Every structure is written in structure tokens, then in C-alpha cells.
């Protein structure tokens, strides 16, 4: 999936090139769809009042918009995602709901979607943090590991716009962080999903070396080097394995001079 455009909320009916649009819907929401044209807003409000739209967290309602009914509306489909109670929404629940929306859109016949970002954010929360969580959840929602399947269900190449009243560099940063984080998590999931006879210490070491660049330095210690350092507890875990263990040391050095140092120690156990 790719981000191609960020739109201003005022231009929702004109500037978006997407063929569908997505709104969030809270239980106690009063002002529902005021940012779309009057006729479409009236229809959606009636559907909501009649109980045809679900605001339950994670529920998806799909509305088709024939021109004879939705006059002057530029989208062929409307996706409404339930967000539950306004004061209960947090990063994790929004991420989960966005994942549901992603899976629903993947199985539909639309190729692009415009997120009305303001409708997914409650006023009490940090707008940019929730925006990042929403995009992360949407991008991760379509993940599947089908490397070894004979019939692969390829991920749809879906383009999307983000419509927001807060168009600035902070929103750009939040969206870019979400894209980077989701891609990193997908790679981690791929590692975990590999079968044990494939993901050996050597393969995990190769993956780490491939990640290294000018800012990320990778050093791999083999059995003899670990033995020399007296790492007997570490070596004892792998003494029954056919393959010798590897200790992977990754060092991140940012371009800016930062005196703070943060250490993350992770454990990766492979089985043969």
C-alpha cells in the first residue's frame, strides 16, 4: 500500500482522486458527516438514526453510492468503521479497528480510499499519535505470510489519500513513522513465521547483516568468539544444536551527535 496525497478537509468533494471514502463513527457522535455535501450528509444521518450503521468498535458498514441517490458525490463506496465510545478510544483500539477496515477494503473491488482522518480522532487525545496508530493498523491489517503457499493471495496495491484539518509537517512525520513502523513489523513477522528448518542462526545473522548501513552497524560473534568472552550460559542453550550459535550485535549511530545511549537486548531462539 502507498500514500500518494494529503488533502485539506475543505476540499473533500473535489481534490481527492480516490474511488472510496472512509469515516469513523463514535457511539455518542453528534456531528456526523458535515464535511460532505448536504444531500449525502442527510442520507448518512438517516441511516445512522435508523440503526443501519454500527458504531461498535471494529464493525464495518459499507454503503454504495449510486448517482441517482448520492447526487454530486465523487465516491462509489463509503466505509464506516465503528469506534465505540469517544472516551474509550486509545492507540491500541484504533489500531485494531483500522486493521479491520484494511481487511475489508482488501476484499472489496476498490483500488483507492480517502481517509477522513478527523473522524477517527477524539478531541481528548493526541491527534498525531492517534493518526500514526490508525495508519499503522491499516497497513498491518492486510499482512499475511504466504511465502510457501501454492496459491498465493497477493496483497492489493491500494493507494490512499488522507484528508485532515491539520495539514502540517507534524502530520507528515506521523504518517511517515507509521509507514516505517509497519514495514519493520512486517519484516519481524516474516522472521517469526519462517519454519524452524529455514530460520537458523546463520539465516538470522544474514538478515541482520543485510539491514546494516552507514547508521546501523552489525557485528556477528561466532562460537569461538563467544567462548573467548566467557559467555558460557549463552553457549549452553545451543549446545545440542547442529548449527553453532551466533550473537548478533547491532549498533545504531544517528547522524546527529546525541550523548544519550539506549540499549535493547533481545532474545531470538531458533530450533532445528
Regions found by a protein language model. Give the residues of each.
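Short amphipathic alpha-helical segment within the helicase RecA-like ATPase core
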Residues: 1-268
Amino acid at each position: 500500500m502507498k500514500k500518494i496525497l494529503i488533502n485539506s478537509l475543505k476540499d473533500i468533494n473535489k481534490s481527492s482522486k480516490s474511488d472510496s471514502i472512509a469515516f469513523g463513527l463514535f457511539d455518542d457522535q453528534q456531528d456526523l458527516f458535515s464535511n460532505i455535501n448536504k444531500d449525502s450528509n442527510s442520507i448518512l444521518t438517516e441511516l445512522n438514526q435508523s440503526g443501519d450503521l454500527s458504531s461498535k468498535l471494529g464493525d464495518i458498514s459499507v454503503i454504495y453510492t449510486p448517482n441517482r441517490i448520492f447526487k454530486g458525490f465523487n465516491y462509489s463506496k463509503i466505509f464506516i468503521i465503528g469506534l465505540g465510545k469517544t472516551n474509550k478510544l486509545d492507540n491500541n483500539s484504533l489500531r485494531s479497528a483500522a486493521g479491520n477496515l484494511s481487511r475489508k477494503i482488501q476484499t472489496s473491488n476498490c483500488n483507492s480510499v480517502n481517509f477522513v482522518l478527523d473522524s477517527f480522532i477524539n478531541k481528548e487525545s493526541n491527534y498525531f499519535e492517534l493518526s500514526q496508530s490508525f495508519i499503522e493498523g491499516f497497513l498491518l491489517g492486510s499482512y499475511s505470510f504466504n511465502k510457501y503457499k501454492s496459491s498465493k493471495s497477493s496483497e492489493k496495491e491500494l493507494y490512499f489519500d488522507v484528508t485532515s484539518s491539520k495539514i502540517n509537517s507534524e502530520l507528515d512525520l506521523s504518517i511517515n513513522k507509521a509507514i516505517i513502523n509497519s514495514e519493520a513489523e512486517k519484516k519481524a513477522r516474516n522472521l517469526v513465521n519462517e519454519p524452524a528448518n529455514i530460520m537458523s542462526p546463520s539465516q538470522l545473522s544474514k538478515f541482520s547483516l543485510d539491514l546494516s548501513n552507514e547508521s546501523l552497524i552489525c557485528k556477528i560473534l561466532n562460537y569461538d568468539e563467544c567462548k573467548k568472552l566467557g559467555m558460557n550460559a549463552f553457549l549452553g542453550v545451543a549446545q545440542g544444536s547442529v548449527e553453532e550459535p551466533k550473537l548478533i550485535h547491532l549498533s545504531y549511530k544517528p547522524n546527529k551527535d546525541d550523548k544519550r545511549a539506549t540499549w535493547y537486548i533481545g532474545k531470538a531462539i531458533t530450533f532445528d
